Structures are given as structure tokens and as C-alpha cells.
A protein has these predicted regions:
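A contiguous loop/helix-start segment that scaffolds small-molecule binding in enzyme catalytic cores
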Residues: 1-6, 20, 69-70, 138-223
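Short, hinge-like loop/turn segments at secondary-structure boundaries
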Residues: 49-50, 113-117, 186-189
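Conserved beta-strand termini and adjacent loop/short-helix elements that scaffold enzyme active sites
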Residues: 51, 99-101, 122-124, 172-174
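Short, glycine-/small-residue-rich phosphate/pyrophosphate-handling segment
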Residues: 109-140, 147
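Glycine-rich, charge-decorated loop segments at or immediately adjacent to ligand/cofactor-binding or catalytic sites
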Residues: 106-114, 179-183
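A short alpha->loop->secondary-structure connector
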Residues: 89-96, 114-118, 162-167
């Protein structure tokens, strides 16, 4: 039986999980997660450990726990820009059970009515805002995993600077939870106060005649 359980959890906490996922958590001897994740857990005799930083410390700890029933709590889908990728590099998949919850991408597409295949996914977690530039094409639909509560304003400013000030921005906070909130606006006139640090941004790109388009692919333009 795999000793390492990786369970994706959403804003509803245990209430949003399957019976199998709840059992994997409740029967673990050690539960590791972010402060937000652990705050959703009931008080039990289990050892609760807050995710250390950097991630290498967590991987070293998990090596010490090898063979002990250990559950790592992740946000949404652990394999979608989550901890799952690092864990799969560190441990054989046969030693793990990974149970995802809906990802921020899935939830955002459901809220917006956008098919996954029509959407570009960009994460700003620990990445420069400038990476978004290469995705800015007229009528593109982009889901952005925010870095923090300031990301919506920073994205709106970048869009405006790049000539895409007409773009529609929708900020989705706490999707699936009781505090879920949706904020909509236009990039060039965005003046919303920072909200929840945990948010996802859905963008529909609209250009103007003077917009200069960029590409992610290097090279010269055709004559």
C-alpha cells in the first residue's frame, strides 16, 4: 500500500472531498499542508506539519517519513502547477496515491463557460509578470493563477501598457467555497481594491487598432 497520499483540497475543506479522500487523510499518521489547508482539518491525534520553505526541506522531511502513512494536502489538482510534480520527481509513483480536486483552471472554465481547449493557462506563482506578454493575442482567453491579492491590478496595468486596455478581466476568489466572489471590469479602468490573496484571473483579450502584437516564438517576421 502506498505510504504517501497527496490529496487536493478546495475551499470547502473536508466537505468538498470524496469518502476515499477523507479516509486517506483521517488514517494518515502525519498530515502536511499549508496553514490554510490545516485550518480546515479537525483537531485529532495526528501530527500536523506546516509546509516548510523552500520545497527541498519538505522533500527531505518526507524522506524521513518514508514508510509512515503520510498525507500531503495540496490546493485543487496537485498535478496542475502544484506540489505533485516535485513529489513525482522525488518518489516513485508506485509509492504514492494522488487524489485531485478540481483545479483552479477547471473551476474558472466552469464559471466562465470556456472550454479548456480554448484557454491558455499561465501561473504567476514565483514568476515575473512579464511572462504574460507572450500570450496576449486578440480574442485569446487566458486563466491566470495569481501570485497574491495585487496580481489583478498588476495584470490590468500590464494589459493597458501593452495596448490591450479593452480586455475584460474577471477575478474569481475562493471558488467553490462559502466566500466565493466574482469581480469584473475592464483593464484600462480597473480600480478595484485588493481582495483575497487566493484568487484566479480570467481574461478575454481585446485589442485596439494601435496594439503591437508580440509572440512567444522567437524569429523574424516574414516579408
Amino acid at each position: 500500500t502506498p505510504w504517501l497520499r497527496v490529496v487536493g483540497i478546495g475551499d470547502r475543506g473536508l466537505d468538498g472531498l470524496s469518502k476515499e479522500a477523507r479516509e486517506l487523510i483521517s488514517t494518515a499518521e502525519i498530515v502536511i499542508g499549508g496553514k490554510r489547508h490545516l485550518s480546515l482539518m479537525p483537531k485529532t491525534a495526528q501530527e500536523h506539519i506546516v509546509w516548510p520553505s523552500p520545497i527541498s526541506i519538505l522533500l527531505n522531511k518526507l524522506t524521513e517519513f518514508r514508510g509512515t502513512k503520510t498525507c500531503v494536502l495540496a490546493t485543487g489538482d496537485p498535478m496542475c502547477y502544484g506540489i505533485g510534480a516535485s513529489l513525482c520527481k522525488a518518489f516513485p509513483i508506485k509509492e504514492m496515491i494522488i487524489l485531485p480536486s478540481p483545479s483552479a483552471l477547471s473551476l474558472a472554465c466552469a464559471r466562465m463557460g470556456w472550454p479548456h481547449q480554448d484557454v491558455e493557462l499561465v501561473t504567476l506563482h514565483g514568476r515575473p509578470l512579464a511572462i504574460l506578454r507572450g500570450y496576449l493575442q486578440p480574442l485569446a482567453k487566458i486563466v491566470v493563477l495569481s501570485n497574491d491579492e495585487n496580481s489583478p491590478r498588476e495584470v490590468a496595468e500590464l494589459l493597458t501598457e501593452q495596448g490591450f486596455g479593452n480586455s475584460q478581466i474577471t477575478v474569481l476568489e475562493h471558488m467553490g467555497g462559502s466566500s466565493e466572489r466574482r469581480i469584473e471590469g475592464i483593464a484600462r479602468s480597473w480600480n478595484e481594491k485588493p481582495g483575497a490573496s487566493f484568487n484566479t484571473i480570467a481574461i478575454e483579450i481585446f485589442s485596439s487598432p494601435e496594439t503591437v502584437l508580440m509572440t512567444r516564438h522567437p524569429g523574424l517576421e516574414d516579408d
